UniProtKB/Swiss-Prot annotation:
It is found in: Cytoplasm. PANTHER family: ARGININOSUCCINATE LYASE. This is Argininosuccinate lyase. It comes from Neisseria gonorrhoeae (strain ATCC 700825 / FA 1090). The keyword Coiled coil does not apply. Pathway: Amino-acid biosynthesis; L-arginine biosynthesis; L-arginine from L-ornithine and carbamoyl phosphate: step 3/3.
Length: 458
């Protein structure tokens, strides 16, 4: 008997170097449980279609149950000579149950088999990821609710722009993660299409009933073109793109946490368990976790580019190139899952420093726009108000004080429209409360948005 299922065509064995270079068992063995799921459904369909006997099905189920137990207990071996997870499991099954194991592959190719395995695996990973996204959102919502009144500088160009609520800032990331959740839901629709039954590329001559297999495996749709079914990796690229966006959002938050934790900002502190020290500088507390998230985002984005490049020049249908889809896909899911898990825990360990944040607001003329709006409401055209306030800011800057610290006489020197009610406008808290509309930064709006998100995820 040949050591490979296809070696009867060849006059010489494959070299050891080629075996090592082309084998995928080192990484695709993680698909084993999903491969068994697909095989059991395929066997049941073949039995109902009259291709396999009931005895064959009974033997296959028994053998697969034993193999699954070996996999979960770590007792199974994965010989390199058998190339991949599919051939390893088939050989193990045949060793256990004999000819019924050889019949299992009837009407099926590894091409549609592996495409099915990946989709089954990825479908489960998306479920895990979506649960973790919601868990992180909950951590951010808790922070937002606790700090709805905490005022901080909002930035544009990393320069102080206007006062915002820290809670409002956290809600911005809740919104981003909400879109990420939606993208995963949308991606799952295209992942959840069954290629099994396409065989190598043209379908099969056996009387298969793909609807039965799809129902058994929980696929909502069936791939309608056999060529496309075995060669499509759009779903993998789409998932990696969605995962890249999640990592981009977490990288942006990481950058802010790193800045805010630095003494130059001093807005927050991160719990010790997420930081490390220095081997030479005793005073150091380094935000390693957010820094590493920032770095790992590039890794996931790199996988996206790799998968796109992998597919760009392939003719129909299946090509060996596609073996290279698994490692970037696996690593993308692993990295994202690990990052989401640690991030939710880390955000629950963030300590906010409202006093430092408010002091920073007072150093950047953050209420200048509020003064301009004040003058507009008194009847001054906005462009004129903009110019007047710019002059007032320059004067305050030269005097080394905030706008709210200028005496009334000085402010009236820029416009007689200004009266003593202006000081209610120039405080950071007044600025927050004035923006009390849908999407605004007022504490009342922050609480309403927190409530809305909690109700949506309940």
């Amino acid at each position: 008997m040949h050591d490979k299922t296809w070696s009867g065509r060849f006059n010489e064995p494959v070299s050891e170097l080629v075996k090592q270079y082309t084998a995928s068992i080192g990484f695709d063995q993680r698909l084993a449980e999903w491969d068994i799921q697909g095989s059991l459904a395929h066997a049941q369909m073949l039995t109902r279609s009259g291709v396999l006997s009931e005895n064959d099905l009974t033997d296959i189920r028994r053998g697969m149950s034993e193999i699954l137990e070996e996999i979960r207990s770590g007792k199974i071996e994965w010989p390199l000579d058998l190339e991949d997870v599919h051939m390893n499991i088939e050989r193990r099954l045949t060793d256990k149950i004999g000819d019924a194991g050889k019949r299992l592959h009837t009407g099926r190719s590894r091409n549609d088999q592996v495409a099915t395995d990946i989709r089954l695996w990825l479908r489960d990973q998306i479920t895990v990821i979506q649960n973790l996204i919601q868990n992180l959102q909950t951590a951010l919502l808790d922070l937002a609710e606790q700090n709805a009144e905490a005022v901080m500088p909002g930035f544009t160009h990393l320069q102080v722009a206007q006062p915002v609520s820290f809670g409002h800032h956290m809600l911005a990331y809740v919104e981003m993660l909400g879109r990420d959740f939606e993208r995963m839901t949308d991606c799952r629709k295209r992942v959840n299409r069954m290629p099994l039954g396409a065989a190598a590329l043209a379908g099969t001559t056996y009387p298969i009933q793909r609807e039965i297999t799809a129902e058994l495996l929980g696929f909502e749709q069936i791939c309608q073109n056999s060529l496309d079914a075995v060669s499509d990796r759009d779903f993998a690229i789409e998932f990696t793109a969605a995962a890249s966006l999640v990592m981009v959002h977490l990288s942006r938050l990481s950058e802010e946490l790193i800045l805010w934790m630095s003494p130059r900002f001093g807005f927050i502190d991160i719990a010790d368990r997420f930081c490390t020290g220095s081997s030479i500088m005793p005073q150091k507390k380094n935000p390693d976790v957010p820094e590493l998230v920032r770095g790992k985002s590039g890794r996931v984005i790199g996988h996206l580019i790799g998968l796109i490049t992998l597919m760009k020049s392939q003719p129909l249908a299946y090509n060996k190139d596609n073996q290279e889809d698994k490692e970037p896909l696996f690593d993308t899911a692993d990295t994202l899952i690990d990052t989401l898990r640690i991030y939710a825990d880390m955000m629950r360990g963030v300590t906010v420093k409202p006093g430092n944040m408010r002091a920073a607001v007072m150093q950047g003329f953050a209420t200048a726009t509020d003064l301009a709006d004040y003058l507009v409401k008194k009847g001054m055209p906005f462009r004129d108000a903009h110019e007047v306030v710019a002059q007032a800011v320059r004067h305050a800057d030269e005097a080394g004080v905030d706008l709210s610290e200028l005496p009334l006489e000085a402010l009236q020197g820029f416009s007689k429209l200004i009266s003593d009610d202006v000081y209610g406008v120039l405080t950071p808290e007044g600025s927050l409360n004035a923006r009390n509309h849908l999407g605004g930064t007022a504490p009342e709006q922050v609480r309403l948005q927190v409530k809305r998100w909690r109700e949506m995820s309940a």
